[in-house]
């Protein structure tokens, strides 16, 4: 009793000890940092702010998930666990059969890339603590600054508090892109088909180079790092292993300017991963780490195998497969098939402001940048999406279907201005623009037919009768878990995104509903609001809560051009897949590992809704409210109708041939 009182008193007098954010997580070069001091400073500087309130909300949701997971775990009987262990044993044999130790993968990561480039440009700041960014947000920090606890994605005013002598250098993406291109010239000498994770990292399959030249993976890594330094004057670190997942982990071991080689031997790999903290794995972020550790007692990768029965009992099969693969040291070994781009975007983070002139100026810059990138890649698109992050960290998205395909900065700015105007007045800390629905997609395929051929519906009657609460799943791409930056890359200052290669925490960005006895957990803020139709970024889909009214507080002005159908969806919740694999809108089943297909499926629903709105705006009849596979397709040339099809509006929609799950029955039967 006394111990409990003492602990409670200690927590109230030292509240920062329980305050964990992305800023308090160690990166390379932060090993000797006084973590308690960093926690205290971040806590004191953030307390009472909108960011602080948002972090508290997320912390409460995370604790709720942990308690929910504990409750479910406690309900499992020994017989349940025994049956799930049989599943685990069988799955281990199947996964082991896929182990490939014949490939040699190299992951190369530039050392504090932005900061290193700036130091190269201005040698006077060499050896001094510096950060790229400003007082509102920093993109990265050099190793001298990291010793004080300064790191990427940290507000500059907090970084200045931690390190009073910190030097700020403004972001210059033109410069970083130039040096990135130089490094990639070197990479192509070793693997013409290397995978670029971002501007400053890449994955190379060096199997053939090693075989042809009779060199080991370590020797090739040493040579490549030397070549990068000769070409750019910048240092990099490398990891060599049998697959991409392990290679990425290895590249972080001897940072900066070092390398680590993990031999292609099963026993060596198993020993390596046995004591590896789960947080070291790409795709496992703060939320997943805490759920695994606090709810299931899993701290290391080895324990994922030891407690595999719990994972398969409590998570979706795809998520459990990922965790089990990690515990076995398995990862991607084949070069992923090149896929066509589905969208292209640019965004900027800055100090929260409601100054309309400044916001329009930022929008102008983004339109120019996006147009430049599209012209560079020969792209024209028709769907424009505006993304806003408000001062209170609420994400809002607006989309418009343009009258023609374009890559013109004037066209982009014209429509983006209308979208922004509809949101004003608002205080914003991030603006982003994205173009999707490229003309190539329309010319080369029928959207509806393409979806049917790619997404085969496989129904499991036992799953249909299962309550959502019985299968809490996590979204992630098991094949691409090592193809992304640290989660902080998604909140870096002035990020310039032209691809969707960012993998987020497998739990933190899946705020899907947890259902207990038919009731939604009450603490989720969005549940208390009126229904909002949402268009979400990345691989997100439209989400709908039943028996609520639409929120029209952010709708477009009545004087909007009728031919430009605008959809307004404040983004307050991430994607929603029933049982972790079933689209809530149309019932199509897509495993979490199909990240690109989910993105395309999301874009299809968005485009279809915009098309329906366009049709409805020119028709006197009330448009259908069903958000399912559409009745029309977008094409530059009208498709010829069959002789017996006199009225295209009377055709039987393709979705009528598919059986919907119980969760979607109300949606699809509504007229």
UniProtKB/Swiss-Prot annotation:
Active-site residues, record numbering mapped to chain = 201
Q: Residues at site: Substrate discrimination? A: 114
InterPro entries under this entry? DNA/RNA_pol_sf, DNA_pol_Y-fam_lit_finger_sf, DNA_pol_Y-fam_little_finger, DNA_polymerase-Y, DNApol_IV, Rev_trsase/Diguanyl_cyclase, UBZ3, UmuC
Span of zinc fingers (UBZ3-type): 576-613
Residues annotated as binding Zn(2+) are 583, 586, 601, 605
Q: Which reaction does it catalyse?
A: DNA(n) + a 2'-deoxyribonucleoside 5'-triphosphate = DNA(n+1) + diphosphate
Disulfide bonding pattern of the chain: none
Annotated Mg(2+) binding lies at 109, 200
Q: What is known of its domains?
A: The C-terminal region negatively affects catalytic efficiency for correct nucleotide insertion, thus decreasing the fidelity of the enzyme.
Its protein name is DNA polymerase kappa
Q: Read off the lineage from the record.
A: Eukaryota, Viridiplantae, Streptophyta, Embryophyta, Tracheophyta
Query: Which gene carries the instructions for this protein?
Result: POLK
């Amino acid at each position: 009793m006394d111990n409990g009182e003492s602990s409670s008193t200690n927590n109230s007098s030292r509240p920062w000890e329980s305050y964990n954010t992305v800023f308090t997580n160690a990166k390379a070069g932060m090993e000797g940092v006084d973590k308690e001091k960093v926690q205290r400073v971040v806590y004191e500087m953030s307390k009472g702010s909108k960011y602080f309130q948002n972090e508290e909300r997320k912390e409460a949701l995370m604790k709720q998930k942990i308690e929910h997971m504990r409750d479910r775990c406690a309900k499992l009987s020994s017989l349940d666990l025994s049956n799930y262990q049989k599943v685990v044993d069988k799955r281990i044999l199947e996964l082991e059969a896929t182990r490939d130790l014949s490939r040699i993968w190299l992951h190369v990561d530039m050392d504090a890339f932005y900061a290193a480039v700036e130091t190269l440009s201005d040698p006077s700041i060499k050896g001094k603590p510096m950060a790229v960014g400003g007082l509102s947000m920093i993109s990265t920090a050099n190793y001298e600054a990291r010793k004080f606890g300064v790191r990427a994605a940290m507000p500059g005013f907090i970084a200045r508090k931690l390190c009073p002598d910190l030097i700020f250098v403004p972001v210059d993406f033109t410069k970083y892109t130039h040096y990135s291109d130089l490094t990639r010239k070197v990479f192509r000498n070793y693997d013409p088909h290397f995978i670029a994770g971002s501007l400053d990292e890449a994955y190379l399959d060096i199997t053939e180079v090693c075989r042809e030249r009779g060199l080991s993976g370590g020797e090739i890594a040493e040579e490549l790092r030397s070549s990068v330094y000769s070409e750019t004057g910048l240092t990099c670190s490398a990891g060599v292993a049998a697959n991409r997942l392990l290679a990425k982990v290895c590249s972080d071991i001897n940072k900066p300017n070092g390398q680590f080689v993990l031999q292609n031997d099963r026993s060596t790999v198993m020993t390596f991963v046995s004591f590896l903290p789960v947080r070291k794995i790409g795709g496992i972020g703060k939320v997943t780490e805490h759920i695994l550790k606090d709810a299931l007692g899993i701290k290391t990768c080895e324990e994922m195998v030891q407690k595999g029965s719990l994972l398969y009992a409590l998570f979706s099969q795809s998520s459990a497969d990922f965790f089990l693969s990690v515990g076995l040291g398995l990862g991607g070994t084949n070069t992923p098939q090149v896929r066509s781009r589905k969208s292209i975007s640019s965004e900027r983070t800055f100090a929260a402001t409601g100054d309309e002139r400044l916001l329009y100026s930022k929008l102008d810059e983004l339109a120019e940048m996006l147009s430049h990138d599209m012209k560079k890649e020969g792209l024209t698109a028709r769907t424009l999406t505006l993304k806003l992050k408000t001062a209170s960290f609420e994400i809002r998205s607006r989309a418009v279907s343009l009258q023609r395909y374009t890559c013109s900065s004037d066209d982009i700015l014209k429509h983006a201005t209308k979208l922004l105007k509809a949101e004003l007045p608002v205080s914003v800390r991030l603006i982003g623009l994205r173009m999707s629905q490229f003309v190539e997609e329309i010319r080369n395929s029928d959207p509806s037919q393409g979806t049917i051929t790619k997404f085969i519906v496989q129904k499991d009657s036992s799953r249909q009768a299962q309550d959502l609460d019985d299968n809490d799943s996590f979204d992630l791409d098991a094949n691409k878990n090592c193809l992304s930056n640290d989660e902080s890359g998604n909140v870096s200052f002035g990020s310039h995104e032209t691809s969707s290669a960012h993998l987020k925490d497998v739990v933190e960005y899946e705020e899907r509903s947890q259902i207990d006895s038919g009731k939604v957990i009450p603490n989720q803020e969005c549940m208390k609001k009126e229904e909002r139709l949402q268009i979400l970024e990345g691989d997100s889909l439209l989400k709908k809560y039943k028996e609520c009214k639409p929120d029209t507080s952010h709708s477009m002005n009545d004087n909007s051009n009728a031919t430009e159908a605008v959809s307004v969806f404040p983004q307050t919740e991430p994607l929603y897949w029933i049982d972790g694999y079933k689209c809530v809108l149309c019932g199509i089943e897509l495993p979490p590992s199909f990240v690109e297909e989910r993105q395309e499926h999301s874009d299809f629903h968005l485009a279809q809704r915009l098309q329906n709105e366009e049709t409805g705006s020119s028709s006197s009849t009330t448009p259908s409210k069903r958000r399912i596979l559409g009745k029309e397709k977008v094409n530059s040339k009208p498709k010829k109708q069959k002789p017996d099809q006199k009225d295209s509006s009377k055709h039987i929609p393709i979705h009528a041939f598919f059986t919907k799950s119980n969760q979607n029955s109300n949606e699809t039967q509504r007229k």
